[in-house]
Regions:
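Active-site microenvironments that recognize anionic phosphate/pyrophosphate groups
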Residues: 1-124, 130-195, 208-267
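Gly/Ser/Thr-rich active-site loops/lids in small-molecule metabolic enzymes
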Residues: 198-202
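Aromatic-lined carbohydrate-binding surfaces of glycoside hydrolases
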Residues: 205
Length: 267
């Protein structure tokens, strides 16, 4: 794995040719995440349950030096919204346990690609953590916006359509979303540590169930600001309804075909 830089902007690009060797289970490769195939992955870091129901191991085809896979169920065809509440809670707890271990990196990205259109090559339920040696430009820009703001834009989200509210979280359809039906799950408290993992897991499950009405593929990403104390972490969830095309690639500007005000009613 190496880095290259855009000769105009200096923006970093990760060069990882070994990722071309990833197995594509959608194209007939055997699933390396199923029970009985443990020798097809690097030695595990940890597991939950015996026999295991959650398993964590290094990514065999890492985009950076520190990259991990969290297989979230032993069942090949399981879905996150079908997990028992305590199982989903444990998945979220493991996210943050592993995040703390990898926090020596400049940035840690927790994300899920679910479905072929979302970028998954293996349909077996899993998420990933990637530690980066630099803070991505998007995170830098958002962190600077938090630092400039007179008050935190995520501590008061009343201007955004509310999908659901719990004691510790708000699930909203944000204005200015780049993608149709994009959602955020935002903690009410301005803090870097997650509150009530069971509550967060339940909202994630509800969001996944809602997104399945729209698309069979989705992504989620935990957006965090380890270098900016005024940052406010949140989860971004995007059902994949369109392919990013030439206009978006060429301009960096997105066209959203679903107004946020209409989304809350659908969910």
């Amino acid at each position: 794995v190496t880095e290259a830089r855009n000769p105009i902007t200096g923006e970093r690009v990760i060069v990882a040719p070994q990722r071309e060797e990833r197995p594509n289970v959608y194209e007939g490769a055997p699933c390396p995440f199923c029970p009985g195939a443990e020798n097809e992955t690097p030695p595990e870091i940890c597991r939950d349950g015996d026999p295991w129901r959650i398993r964590v191991f290094p990514n065999r085809y890492p985009p950076t030096e520190h990259a991990e896979i969290i297989v979230e169920s032993a069942l090949h065809d399981d879905a996150f919204d079908a997990l028992a509440p305590d199982h989903a809670q444990r998945v979220v707890e493991i996210y943050f346990e592993r995040y703390r271990v990898l926090a020596t990196n400049a940035y840690v990205c927790i994300f899920k690609n679910d479905g072929r259109m979302a970028g998954a090559s293996i349909p077996h339920l899993h998420s990933q953590l990637v530690g980066l040696p630099f803070v991505p430009p998007r995170i830098v820009a958002e962190g600077e916006a938090f630092a400039r703001a007179a008050s935190c834009p995520l501590c008061d989200v009343r201007m955004h359509p509310l999908i659901r509210e719990t004691e510790h979280y708000r699930w909203i359809a944000p204005h200015g979303a780049r993608f149709a039906y994009q959602q955020w799950i935002v903690p009410k408290a301005h803090e870097h540590q997650p509150a009530e993992p069971r509550e967060l897991a339940s909202l994630l499950q509800s969001s996944v169930a809602a997104m399945r009405k729209i698309s069979s593929a989705f992504n989620w990403t935990f957006i965090n600001f380890p270098r900016e104390p005024r940052g406010h972490w949140y989860v971004e969830l995007i059902p994949r309804t369109v392919v990013i095309a030439g206009f978006e690639i060429g301009t960096g500007t997105f066209v959203n075909t679903a107004a946020p005000d209409t989304i809350a009613g659908l969910f």
